[in-house]
Amino acid sequence: MPVAVGVIQTDGFPAVLAAADAMVKAASVTLVSFDKAERAQFYVAVRGPVSEVERSMEAGIAAAEETYNGTVITHYMIPNPPDNVETVMPIAYSDEVEPFRV
């Protein structure tokens, strides 16, 4: 089963928190990264089956946009990312994430 990665970057912490919450509740995905991108921008990354990541991205974008002053800066999904992408980006399943892996 192909595994995808989906990333949403928002302006402000409440929007990314709402996105992360909606993403893991809307689909069977694993939250693999959640961090500050720059200044007041944050990003969240999830992994899972392609169809589940698509569904979680839709929910995350909607939740972030519904947040007071919430703005989605950008979003992207990579179906079946190659190993070298995992090597250079923080999207791999880490030891902290492994117990929650879906």
UniProtKB/Swiss-Prot annotation:
Gene3D superfamilies xrefs: 3.30.70.1710
Localization per record: Carboxysome
Molecular-function annotations in GO: structural constituent of carboxysome shell
Example of a GO cellular component annotation carried by this entry: carboxysome
Domain of life where this protein originates: Bacteria
Pfam families referenced in this protein's UniProt entry, alphabetically: BMC (PF00936)
Gene Ontology biological-process annotations: carbon fixation; photosynthesis
Residue ranges annotated for the BMC domain, each copy included: 4-90
UniProt keyword annotations, A-Z: Bacterial microcompartment, Carbon dioxide fixation, Carboxysome, Photosynthesis
Alphabetized InterPro entries for the sequence: Bact_microcomp_CS (IPR020808), BMC_dom (IPR000249), BMC_shell (IPR050575), CcmK (IPR046380), CcmK-like_sf (IPR037233), CcmK/CsoS1_BMC (IPR044872)
Main location class: other
Family annotation (PROSITE patterns): BMC_1, BMC_2
Xref: SUPFAM superfamilies: CcmK-like (SSF143414)
Assembly: Interacts stably with CcmK4, forming heterohexamers that can make dodecamers. Heterohexamers have a 1:2 CcmK3:CcmK4 stoichiometry. Upon expression in E.coli forms oligomers that could be dimers or trimers, but never hexamers; bulky residues in the pore region probably preclude the formation of homohexamers.
Stated family: Belongs to the bacterial microcompartments protein family. CcmK subfamily.
Described purpose of this protein according to its UniProt entry: A probably non-essential, minor shell protein of the carboxysome, a polyhedral inclusion where RuBisCO (ribulose bisphosphate carboxylase, rbcL-rbcS) is sequestered. Hexamers form sheets that form the facets of the polyhedral carboxysome. In PCC 7418 there are several CcmK paralogs with presumably functional differences. This subunit probably only makes heterohexamers with CcmK4. Heterohexamers can also make dodecamers, formation depends on buffer conditions.
Protein name: Carboxysome shell protein CcmK3
Naturally occurring in which organism (per UniProt): Halothece sp. (strain PCC 7418)
